[in-house]
Amino acid sequence: MGLPWYRVHTVVLNDPGRLLSVHIMHTALVSGWAGSMALYELAVFDPSDPVLDPMWRQGMFVIPFMTRLGITNSWGGWSISGGTVTNPGIWSYEGVAGAHIVFSGLCFLAAIWHWVYWDLEIFCDERTGKPSLDLPKIFGIHLFLAGVACFGFGAFHVTGLYGPGIWVSDPYGLTGKVQAVNPAWGAEGFDPFVPGGIASHHIAAGTLGILAGLFHLSVRPPQRLYKGLRMGNIETVLSSSIAAVFFAAFVVAGTMWYGSATTPIELFGPTRYQWDQGYFQQEIYRRVSDGLAENLSLSEAWSKIPEKLAFYDYIGNNPAKGGLFRAGSMDNGDGIAVGWLGHPIFRDKEGRELFVRRMPTFFETFPVVLVDEEGIVRADVPFRRAESKYSVEQVGVTVEFYGGELNGVSYSDPATVKKYARRSQLGEIFELDRATLKSDGVFRSSPRGWFTFGHATFALLFFFGHIWHGARTLFRDVFAGIDPDLDAQVEFGTFQKVGDPTTRRQPV
């Protein structure tokens, strides 16, 4: 049978045994990839600095997903939070990876068994002796089992009743840890940033799935609905399954890109909107103001800012700064962060405090402009020196650092002041090691960006797949060339040409 590449799946169209086999093999491939990828990431992951070189800076993709589900320890003796562990237990990162690989092997063997032993009694209609599947019944079984898994995850794993809980953090991604979560049954449960909603929604959705599954197991679909929705056609199953998958892909692309309790910034990096809105900058200034209100000096107030919080307020951690075709981790772009230099405060010769305008997300270059607290431009780095009025030299701008490695250091040399003004466009200033990884200095996206791009793209492709297969199954008679006005029962293969006008017509 000379099938073109895009038609090869017809070999399992009317073969339930081998249809099952290829799906088990697909599960083997997915699970095997997950386990192998986890082992690869663990081989290259450096857990030594969870603050300035976290997993998302290193381009880890599957480690964050394991961590958000409660895995924090490694058989290598390290913990994701930076400490050491002596007894990580079986469910470490390596344990989960190994379990996926073992499961993949078992699925591989099961797929081979079902390919060889395809002609099983269970797949045959006892009335006709031909292969057939009771698709509404199978739908009920799968819905029931999915409901049980969903309910179990929400009621046991997330709540810590039987399981570790999930990763929970504060709004600024500073205090994250794995902990049990109580279900949120009030209106707050609909807030995408409330972890309790994860537990309550899984419990509710699981309960609904169990009830719906039992309904579909006990109630047969009406004949008109069965025929109208082509419930006897396996391509209907394909079409509706693709719909479920593309819908889920669109949803998770949104929760990843815009942020939610399911995508903590400690595991996936900050979102672009946190840079756009000055989210971390506002929190830093609030903390400094509180420190000054407690009679701390400016230097002491800035020194109390956690390095982790300052690092979030750096444009290099913005997932929208990476180009679409710039492969590699963030560390391969601007380098490995070594330390926070401190917060630079610029002043003109009249003593006014000046603020550097920050670079918007979608700019590669941006003019260096310093404004006062009222937003009036007081200094800049001019493009044309001949026409400049606000140059650093003319205005006499100086810079002094507070907190960080350069705490208390000040510069009045114009070249140095301009250097730090340029770097202030990018947020807080960090020392970056570009030599170790031969980093090229061009920003990369975080796993947050890659996940969103991948899932949004595949969701769009799968959307078209749903339309394609849905149309094929709904209009199968039209595509097959059968005259819709034909009132005789025509059997495929009985006549030389289906829809031939010489075919005898008789009322059904």
Curated annotation (Swiss-Prot):
Any Pfam family: PSII
InterPro entries assigned to the protein according to its UniProt record, in alphabetical order: PS_antenna-like (IPR000932), PS_II_antenna-like_sf (IPR036001), PSII_PsbB (IPR017486)
Biological role stated in the UniProt entry: One of the components of the core complex of photosystem II (PSII). It binds chlorophyll and helps catalyze the primary light-induced photochemical processes of PSII. PSII is a light-driven water:plastoquinone oxidoreductase, using light energy to abstract electrons from H(2)O, generating O(2) and a proton gradient subsequently used for ATP formation.
Organism: Oryza sativa subsp. japonica (Rice)
Coiled-coil residues: none
GO biological process annotation, one example: photosynthetic electron transport in photosystem II
Topological relation to the membrane, as annotated: Multi-pass membrane protein
Name of this protein: Photosystem II CP47 reaction center protein
Keyword flag Transmembrane helix: yes
